[in-house]
């Protein structure tokens, strides 16, 4: 399922140079523009959220019982979490966990819905993920990603992952990735329209003049940085300007470090209910 805010109405005569002027904030259409296939086992922490037979959002395993995603993704009472997925056509190494109700979902209490700040959510799974399982070729099938510790910067070179539509508009069978340049709130604010619903709890990916904005990944999916201590989840895909395949504006993410206390407290409070 795809999520959209109110998009700009574009006619065929509008030139690419004018698209940024009419672009509107919206949720990503789940696209990896100018990306390439990820290596198997490169991102064992990413999960696919599926309702019925359809992928609707991404997420990241942060503990054996917990997945971190965008708040706007948690709209269904029941859905499946598919971990260990690399190729859509091969589910031989996947682990599937069922979410049976809202009692397994936590959306940030200050998230107001739609495009805006505090777009973050947690999912609890009753059956823990097996984080020690290996695929048939010996790669890690499922693993958790590190949350930022503050030791390393959240900005700089990063990577984005997702199964979204590619340049041609087709959904790839293989997990895709894209190298991105991560910028902080102030720099992102200067690159966006003055009325953009940006908040200090956001970070962005941006390459000036490049058309690789909000299409770059599934809502709720991970933006990571590779550090000497492992892969850190620095951002969660939140929103970007639409039409995403044409705008040169930044993509906007929930900045994970801004919610480290909320994540910790939410998990601890939930544990007391079990």
From Swiss-Prot:
Entry's localization field: Secreted
The keyword Protein biosynthesis belongs to this UniProt entry's keyword annotation: no
Gene3D superfamilies: Trypsin-like serine proteases
Protein EC: 3.4.21.-
Main location: secreted
PROSITE patterns the record matches: TRYPSIN_DOM (PS50240), TRYPSIN_HIS (PS00134), TRYPSIN_SER (PS00135)
SUPFAM superfamilies: Trypsin-like serine proteases
Single biological process term from Gene Ontology: proteolysis
Protein name: Lectizyme
Position of the signal peptide: 1-16
Biological function: Protein with lectin and protease activity involved in the establishment of trypanosome infections in tsetse flies. Binds D-glucosamine and agglutinates bloodstream-form trypanosomes and rabbit red blood cells. Capable of inducing transformation of bloodstream-form trypanosomes into procyclic (midgut) forms in vitro.
Entry's Gene Ontology molecular function annotations: serine-type endopeptidase activity
Keywords: Disulfide bond, Hydrolase, Protease, Secreted, Serine protease, Signal
Inducing or repressing factors: By blood meal.
UniProt superkingdom: Eukaryota
GO cellular component annotations of the record: extracellular region
Tissue expression notes: Expressed in the midgut.
Membership in a protein family: Belongs to the peptidase S1 family.
Gene designation: Gpl
